[in-house]
Amino acid sequence: DAPVELGDPRIELYAAVARRSLDGFADANWHLEQRVSREEGLRMLTLAPAYAAFQETERGSIEVRKQADFSVFSADPMAIPEPGILKIEPELTVIAGEVAYERK
């Protein structure tokens, strides 16, 4: 749905898996049949952009010898109810193996 989304990975994942507005609204125009699984939504935010940038061997997934770029959230977005995805908070962000943000 880019470029209409806000760029926040929580909102992006929610939009992909729920196909609802931020307040939970959806009607026929939201095409709920186009929802994706959480696994596919995660790939859309991680490995797919790396692949599109020809960088899938360096980033896009957590693997040995890949650049360590990742975030840790206050809850598991793969396991909580869909509306909860919007409420999780970043706890830690690592970029190129260095801590860029840590919630105190």
How should each PLM-predicted stretch be described?
Residues 1-79, 83, 88-96:
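His/Asp/Glu-enriched, well-ordered alpha-helical/loop segment
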